[in-house]
């Protein structure tokens, strides 16, 4: 805090572009009666605000802004369309509630007695990538190592989330080396679900489970490892506090599991953790970067199911839904900086980069921040270093997908420092439960919601359509959001919607 204030006194708002890290802060200059809000370049830390009669109310959470008596828990048609057709994502500037906005990543805002102005201090720029392949490999390695080194600075013991995937393994390896140099042992943490070995079902989105890869990395690094195993009953029950943590419906049990996991990590004595988010967005780790039939589809690649969503709603729940989604998608594509020399695929990869950065990555970062902070745990994300982002944005796709592999450049950069099974493990997302008890618990909960005539959430859904999913949960062929969210997560999302409408007494206008 002291460094930040001194930097502001020296350089005013020019100080913001000199910062490296994750932050959201406000500076009040009493004499000038000037308030300055600023948010980090990638939006790792949230910052919400709303105009009021004599100024501005703001905070790191939506709840904080809602505490002001002039701010009403009201959503309009855009907010409802966001929840039902884009959720759990939301437009970058939206707080979903009608009066609440989100300060955009890489922006600062200034409030004076005269006016309120919004300014950009960082944005992506398109450049020719001038480094050859060996230099690019070396530079990628250097940037990731330096970002991790910066994030390892801590006054309290630090641990790592370890899934046995490439990204968490790289960070755990770098942290373990740092700890070994001080003759200390790194603690690592992983999450799993009861009976997941029995019920796990592989797919193109989730080709394998984590267990054997975690064991291999723990043996390789010699970390003190902790496993958290979650029960389906606890996972379902935690959907409610997970909604409260976001102050919005979220990623269903992808949220509630992380909430329980973070709480367990905190109880275990850890205060700060490193996590591998964002490498997939930057270096092309997701299937939608590689499947041609998805890559050039004219919609959000992780949420191609607007028709499915509309089919689950009552006919009058939302209007002009498809156009609403399409407009947000196209506006985002138009924001992607491009070069006149970009070919069709290169231009599309730039669009995909910005789509993922502004929407999918933002959703995951919001999830990580809210679930961890609600548990009193600080989670750092070294791959979100803006220098890595800038370098990756202009890197040719052939380099990123080196050897025809997702994140091929990152694999090559760390090939000599990790077991080959880890280096060449196919991308697998955050683990989810496949336990039938969880599906049944969520379906039963939704039935109770639908029996309650006071439920706003229930009034939005076509009960027959949802009932058909309950009868045949396997009928949903692909995720309706991201890589993990299928039929059980539809039920869980309805539960979270119901909780949100009730808890915040939300009105639709």
Report each predicted region and the residues it spans.
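Long, Lys/Arg- and hydrophobic-enriched amphipathic alpha-helices
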Residues: 250-251, 485
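Hydrophobic pocket-lining residues that define ligand/cofactor binding sites across diverse proteins
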Residues: 265
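Short acidic/histidine-rich active-site segments
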Residues: 270-280, 284-286
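Active-site catalytic pocket residues across diverse enzymes, especially alpha/beta-hydrolases
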Residues: 175-179, 290, 396
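Cysteine-centered catalytic environments shared across enzyme families
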Residues: 1-240, 244-245, 258, 415-416, ...
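Adenosyl-5′-phosphate
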Residues: 14, 66-72, 98-105, 115-116, ...
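A mobile, often basic/glycine-rich helix-loop segment
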Residues: 282-308
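An alpha-helix initiation/capping motif
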Residues: 2, 21, 138, 164, ...
């Amino acid at each position: 805090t002291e460094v930040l204030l001194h930097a502001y006194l020296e350089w005013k708002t020019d100080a913001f572009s000199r910062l490296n890290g994750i932050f959201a802060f406000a500076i009040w200059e009493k004499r000038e009666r000037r308030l300055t809000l600023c948010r980090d370049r990638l939006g790792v830390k949230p910052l919400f605000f709303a105009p009021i009669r004599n100024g501005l109310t703001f905070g790191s959470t939506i709840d904080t802004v809602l505490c002001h008596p002039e701010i009403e828990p009201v959503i309009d048609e855009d907010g409802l369309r966001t929840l039902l057709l884009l959720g759990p994502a939301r437009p970058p500037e939206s707080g979903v509630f009608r009066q609440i906005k989100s300060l955009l990543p890489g922006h600062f805002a200034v409030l004076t007695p005269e006016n309120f102005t919004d300014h950009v201090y960082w944005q992506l720029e398109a450049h020719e990538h001038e480094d050859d392949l060996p230099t690019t490999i070396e530079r990628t390695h250097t940037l990731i190592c330096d970002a991790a080194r910066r994030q390892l600075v801590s006054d309290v013991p630090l641990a790592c989330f370890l899934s046995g995937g490439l990204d968490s393994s790289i960070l755990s390896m770098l942290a373990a080396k740092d700890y070994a140099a001080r003759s200390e042992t790194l603690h690592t943490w992983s999450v799993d679900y009861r009976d997941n070995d029995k019920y796990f079902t592989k797919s193109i989105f989730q080709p394998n489970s984590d267990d054997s890869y975690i064991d291999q990395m723990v043996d390789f690094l010699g970390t003190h490892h902790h496993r958290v195993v979650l029960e389906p009953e606890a996972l379902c029950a935690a959907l409610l506090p997970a909604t409260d943590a976001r102050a919005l419906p979220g990623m269903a049990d992808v949220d509630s599991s992380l909430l329980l996991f973070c709480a367990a990590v905190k109880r275990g004595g850890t205060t700060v953790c490193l996590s591998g988010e964002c490498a997939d967005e930057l270096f092309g780790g997701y299937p939608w970067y590689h499947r041609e039939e998805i890559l050039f589809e004219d919609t959000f690649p992780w949420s191609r199911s607007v028709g499915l969503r509309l089919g689950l709603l009552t006919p009058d729940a939302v209007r002009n839904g498809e156009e609403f989604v399409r407009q947000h998608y196209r506006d985002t594509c138009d924001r992607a900086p491009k070069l006149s020399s970009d070919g069709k695929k290169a231009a599309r990869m730039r669009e995909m980069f910005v789509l993922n950065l502004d929407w999918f990555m933002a959703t995951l970062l919001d999830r990580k921040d809210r679930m961890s902070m609600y548990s009193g745990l600080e989670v750092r994300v070294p791959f979100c270093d803006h220098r890595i982002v800038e370098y990756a944005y202009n890197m040719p796709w052939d380099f990123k997908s080196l050897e025809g592999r997702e994140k091929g450049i990152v694999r090559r950069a760390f090939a000599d420092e990790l077991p080959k099974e880890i280096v060449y493990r196919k991308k697998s997302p955050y683990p989810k439960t496949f336990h039938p008890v969880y599906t049944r618990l969520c379906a039963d909960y939704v039935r109770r919601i639908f029996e309650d005539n006071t439920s706003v959430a229930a009034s939005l859904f076509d009960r027959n359509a949802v009932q058909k999913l309950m009868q045949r949960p396997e009928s949903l062929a692909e995720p309706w959001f991201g890589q993990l969210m299928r039929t059980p997560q539809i039920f869980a999302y309805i539960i979270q919607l119901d909780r949100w409408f009730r808890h915040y007494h939300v009105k639709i206008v």
